[in-house]
């Protein structure tokens, strides 16, 4: 007789990872000046050991990731991205929008005139 094997669902694993990362980020945040600091947990307590191991594992990872993405947050790189986006997509938008609206209006009027019976609309050239 075989016992049923319970497998951890991927969602449960993902939730656990998110919880650990959120906890690590919360521990990384600085305490505002003037606020009383909580008493430090002894390193020998179970949660103190978990905290130290998680911090030991995640601190280099967070630092390395922060250093790798520093170029993105640099004002020059971000300004260059915005300038390129403007040049590629937004330059001349006003004139393009006016031309599109003018063409759409002419097309719509032409279609409406073609649908209108001659008796009601008459000929535009006759007065």
UniProtKB/Swiss-Prot annotation:
Signal peptide: 1-27
InterPro entries, per database record: APOC4
Keyword Chaperone in annotation: no
Cellular localization per UniProt: Secreted
GO biological process, one term: triglyceride homeostasis
Any one Gene Ontology cellular component term annotated for this protein: high-density lipoprotein particle
Keywords, in A-Z order: Lipid transport, Secreted, Signal, Transport
Signal as UniProt keyword: yes
One Pfam family recorded for the sequence: APOC4
Domain of life: Eukaryota
PANTHER family membership: APOLIPOPROTEIN C-IV (PTHR32288:SF0)
Family: Belongs to the apolipoprotein C4 family.
Function as written in the Swiss-Prot or TrEMBL entry: May participate in lipoprotein metabolism.
Protein name, entry field: Apolipoprotein C-IV
Species this protein is from: Tapirus terrestris (Lowland tapir)
